[in-house]
Amino acid sequence: EKNGKWFSSAKLINRFVPTEQKGTFLSRLHMCLKIARGMRRLHAAGLAHSDLSYNNVLVDPLSGSACIIDDDGLVVPGKFPPEVVGTPGFIAPEVLATKALKVDDPKKNLPKRTTDQHALAVLIYTFLLNRHPLDGGKVWDIDPQKDDDMRYGSNALFIEHPTDNTNRIKANQLGKSELPQGDPDKLPYTICGPYLKKLFDRAFID
Protein backbone atom coordinates (compact mmCIF):
# COMPACT_ATOMS: atom_id res chain seq x y z
CA GLU A 1 0.00 0.00 0.00
CA LYS A 2 1.17 3.52 -0.81
CA ASN A 3 0.53 7.06 0.36
CA GLY A 4 -2.63 8.25 -1.37
CA LYS A 5 -0.98 11.41 -2.69
CA TRP A 6 0.65 9.44 -5.54
CA PHE A 7 -2.78 8.73 -7.00
CA SER A 8 -4.35 12.15 -6.45
CA SER A 9 -3.11 14.16 -9.43
CA ALA A 10 -2.62 13.51 -13.13
CA LYS A 11 0.93 14.84 -13.03
CA LEU A 12 2.01 12.46 -10.27
CA ILE A 13 0.27 9.37 -11.54
CA ASN A 14 1.28 9.90 -15.18
CA ARG A 15 4.91 10.74 -14.46
CA PHE A 16 5.86 8.57 -11.52
CA VAL A 17 3.45 5.64 -11.13
CA PRO A 18 4.19 2.62 -13.37
CA THR A 19 1.28 1.63 -15.59
CA GLU A 20 0.99 -1.77 -13.93
CA GLN A 21 0.46 -0.09 -10.53
CA LYS A 22 -2.22 2.43 -11.49
CA GLY A 23 -5.17 0.10 -11.17
CA THR A 24 -8.49 0.60 -12.93
CA PHE A 25 -11.37 2.97 -12.39
CA LEU A 26 -13.28 0.11 -10.75
CA SER A 27 -10.44 -0.81 -8.38
CA ARG A 28 -10.02 2.85 -7.38
CA LEU A 29 -13.77 3.04 -6.77
CA HIS A 30 -13.51 0.04 -4.43
CA MET A 31 -10.65 1.86 -2.71
CA CYS A 32 -12.87 4.90 -2.16
CA LEU A 33 -15.72 2.74 -0.85
CA LYS A 34 -13.43 1.25 1.81
CA ILE A 35 -12.34 4.72 2.94
CA ALA A 36 -15.98 5.87 3.06
CA ARG A 37 -16.96 2.83 5.14
CA GLY A 38 -14.09 3.51 7.53
CA MET A 39 -15.28 7.08 8.00
CA ARG A 40 -18.86 5.90 8.53
CA ARG A 41 -17.71 3.63 11.38
CA LEU A 42 -15.72 6.48 12.89
CA HIS A 43 -18.73 8.80 12.78
CA ALA A 44 -21.02 6.09 14.17
CA ALA A 45 -18.76 6.05 17.24
CA GLY A 46 -19.38 9.78 17.72
CA LEU A 47 -15.92 10.81 16.49
CA ALA A 48 -14.59 13.04 13.73
CA HIS A 49 -11.21 12.56 12.05
CA SER A 50 -10.52 16.30 11.50
CA ASP A 51 -7.61 15.68 9.09
CA LEU A 52 -8.72 13.28 6.37
CA SER A 53 -6.56 13.72 3.26
CA TYR A 54 -4.47 11.75 0.78
CA ASN A 55 -1.60 11.93 3.29
CA ASN A 56 -3.63 10.08 5.90
CA VAL A 57 -4.67 7.05 3.87
CA LEU A 58 -2.72 4.10 2.51
CA VAL A 59 -4.10 2.73 -0.74
CA ASP A 60 -3.54 -0.06 -3.23
CA PRO A 61 -5.25 0.73 -6.55
CA LEU A 62 -4.52 -2.79 -7.82
CA SER A 63 -6.50 -4.65 -5.17
CA GLY A 64 -8.78 -1.75 -4.25
CA SER A 65 -7.74 -1.93 -0.60
CA ALA A 66 -7.32 1.14 1.60
CA CYS A 67 -6.91 2.08 5.24
CA ILE A 68 -7.14 5.32 7.18
CA ILE A 69 -4.02 6.23 9.18
CA ASP A 70 -2.73 9.08 11.38
CA ASP A 71 -5.92 9.28 13.40
CA ASP A 72 -4.19 11.10 16.26
CA GLY A 73 -6.31 14.15 15.45
CA LEU A 74 -9.60 12.46 16.37
CA VAL A 75 -12.11 14.77 18.00
CA VAL A 76 -15.41 14.43 19.83
CA PRO A 77 -17.49 17.26 18.33
CA GLY A 78 -18.74 19.61 21.03
CA LYS A 79 -16.64 18.00 23.78
CA PHE A 80 -13.03 17.38 22.75
CA PRO A 81 -11.70 20.19 20.50
CA PRO A 82 -9.35 19.40 17.59
CA GLU A 83 -5.60 19.90 17.76
CA VAL A 84 -5.48 20.31 13.96
CA VAL A 85 -7.99 21.77 11.51
CA GLY A 86 -6.93 19.65 8.55
CA THR A 87 -4.72 19.58 5.47
CA PRO A 88 -4.89 22.46 2.96
CA GLY A 89 -7.12 21.49 0.06
CA PHE A 90 -9.19 19.15 2.24
CA ILE A 91 -10.28 21.56 4.97
CA ALA A 92 -13.94 22.48 4.60
CA PRO A 93 -14.30 26.08 3.32
CA GLU A 94 -16.27 27.17 6.40
CA VAL A 95 -13.49 25.92 8.70
CA LEU A 96 -10.74 27.58 6.69
CA ALA A 97 -12.65 30.87 6.58
CA THR A 98 -12.64 31.10 10.40
CA LYS A 99 -9.24 29.54 11.15
CA ALA A 100 -7.87 32.80 12.59
CA LEU A 101 -10.54 32.93 15.32
CA LYS A 102 -9.85 31.52 18.79
CA VAL A 103 -11.13 28.05 19.62
CA ASP A 104 -13.66 29.41 22.11
CA ASP A 105 -15.05 31.99 19.67
CA PRO A 106 -18.70 31.06 18.95
CA LYS A 107 -18.23 32.12 15.32
CA LYS A 108 -15.38 29.67 14.75
CA ASN A 109 -16.23 26.59 12.69
CA LEU A 110 -14.49 23.50 14.03
CA PRO A 111 -13.92 20.10 12.40
CA LYS A 112 -16.90 17.75 12.77
CA ARG A 113 -18.70 15.00 10.89
CA THR A 114 -19.88 17.28 8.06
CA THR A 115 -16.40 18.72 7.51
CA ASP A 116 -15.05 15.15 7.33
CA GLN A 117 -17.64 14.54 4.63
CA HIS A 118 -16.27 17.47 2.63
CA ALA A 119 -12.74 16.05 2.89
CA LEU A 120 -14.05 12.62 1.88
CA ALA A 121 -15.76 14.06 -1.21
CA VAL A 122 -12.51 15.81 -2.21
CA LEU A 123 -10.57 12.59 -1.67
CA ILE A 124 -12.97 10.51 -3.79
CA TYR A 125 -12.96 13.12 -6.56
CA THR A 126 -9.16 13.25 -6.65
CA PHE A 127 -8.72 9.47 -6.63
CA LEU A 128 -11.23 8.88 -9.42
CA LEU A 129 -10.42 11.87 -11.64
CA ASN A 130 -6.81 12.70 -10.66
CA ARG A 131 -7.44 16.42 -10.14
CA HIS A 132 -8.63 18.65 -7.29
CA PRO A 133 -12.23 19.93 -7.44
CA LEU A 134 -11.26 23.48 -6.40
CA ASP A 135 -7.90 23.89 -8.21
CA GLY A 136 -8.98 25.77 -11.30
CA GLY A 137 -7.64 28.50 -13.53
CA LYS A 138 -8.66 31.47 -11.39
CA VAL A 139 -5.95 33.33 -9.46
CA TRP A 140 -7.65 34.92 -6.48
CA ASP A 141 -4.65 36.83 -5.10
CA ILE A 142 -1.01 37.39 -6.09
CA ASP A 143 0.07 36.33 -2.60
CA PRO A 144 0.25 32.48 -2.67
CA GLN A 145 -0.98 32.05 0.92
CA LYS A 146 -3.91 34.41 0.43
CA ASP A 147 -4.68 32.73 -2.89
CA ASP A 148 -4.86 29.32 -1.20
CA ASP A 149 -7.00 30.66 1.65
CA MET A 150 -9.45 32.12 -0.85
CA ARG A 151 -9.32 29.16 -3.26
CA TYR A 152 -10.15 26.61 -0.59
CA GLY A 153 -12.01 28.92 1.81
CA SER A 154 -14.04 32.07 1.27
CA ASN A 155 -14.02 31.91 -2.56
CA ALA A 156 -14.13 28.12 -2.98
CA LEU A 157 -15.64 27.40 -6.41
CA PHE A 158 -16.04 24.01 -8.07
CA ILE A 159 -14.00 23.78 -11.28
CA GLU A 160 -16.95 22.08 -12.98
CA HIS A 161 -19.66 24.38 -11.66
CA PRO A 162 -22.57 24.23 -14.13
CA THR A 163 -23.41 27.96 -14.09
CA ASP A 164 -20.21 29.73 -12.98
CA ASN A 165 -17.11 29.14 -15.12
CA THR A 166 -14.92 31.64 -13.24
CA ASN A 167 -12.67 28.86 -11.93
CA ARG A 168 -12.72 26.60 -15.00
CA ILE A 169 -9.44 24.92 -15.85
CA LYS A 170 -7.65 26.42 -18.85
CA ALA A 171 -6.69 23.33 -20.82
CA ASN A 172 -4.13 25.22 -22.92
CA GLN A 173 -2.14 25.87 -19.73
CA LEU A 174 -1.89 22.20 -18.76
CA GLY A 175 1.31 20.24 -19.23
CA LYS A 176 1.43 17.02 -21.21
CA SER A 177 1.67 14.95 -18.04
CA GLU A 178 -1.58 16.48 -16.76
CA LEU A 179 -3.65 15.20 -19.68
CA PRO A 180 -6.21 13.87 -20.20
CA GLN A 181 -7.32 13.77 -16.54
CA GLY A 182 -6.58 17.44 -15.89
CA ASP A 183 -9.08 18.62 -18.51
CA PRO A 184 -12.70 18.37 -17.26
CA ASP A 185 -13.96 18.85 -20.81
CA LYS A 186 -12.35 15.53 -21.76
CA LEU A 187 -13.14 13.70 -18.52
CA PRO A 188 -16.08 15.44 -16.79
CA TYR A 189 -17.10 14.39 -13.30
CA THR A 190 -20.36 13.01 -14.70
CA ILE A 191 -18.44 9.93 -15.93
CA CYS A 192 -18.45 8.80 -12.29
CA GLY A 193 -22.16 8.05 -12.61
CA PRO A 194 -25.36 9.59 -11.21
CA TYR A 195 -24.81 8.63 -7.57
CA LEU A 196 -21.34 10.14 -7.30
CA LYS A 197 -22.43 13.15 -9.36
CA LYS A 198 -25.09 13.77 -6.71
CA LEU A 199 -22.44 13.50 -3.98
CA PHE A 200 -20.10 15.94 -5.73
CA ASP A 201 -22.95 18.37 -6.44
CA ARG A 202 -23.91 18.39 -2.77
CA ALA A 203 -20.30 18.80 -1.61
CA PHE A 204 -19.09 21.42 -4.09
CA ILE A 205 -22.16 23.22 -5.47
CA ASP A 206 -25.18 23.12 -3.12
Question: Each PLM stretch: what is its role?
Answer:
Residues H30, M39, H43-P61:
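Catalytic-loop of the protein kinase fold
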Residues Q117-F127:
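A conserved short alpha-helix in the C-terminal lobe
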Residues P133-D206:
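Helical subdomain adjoining the active site within ATP-dependent kinase catalytic cores
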Residues N130:
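Flexible loop/cap residues within protein kinase catalytic domains
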Residues N55-A100:
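Activation segment/activation loop of eukaryotic-type protein kinase catalytic domains
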Residues I35-L42, I124:
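Conserved hydrophobic alpha-helix
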Residues E1-M31, F80, V85:
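Conserved structural core of kinase catalytic domains
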Residues V95-T114:
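Conserved end of the kinase activation segment
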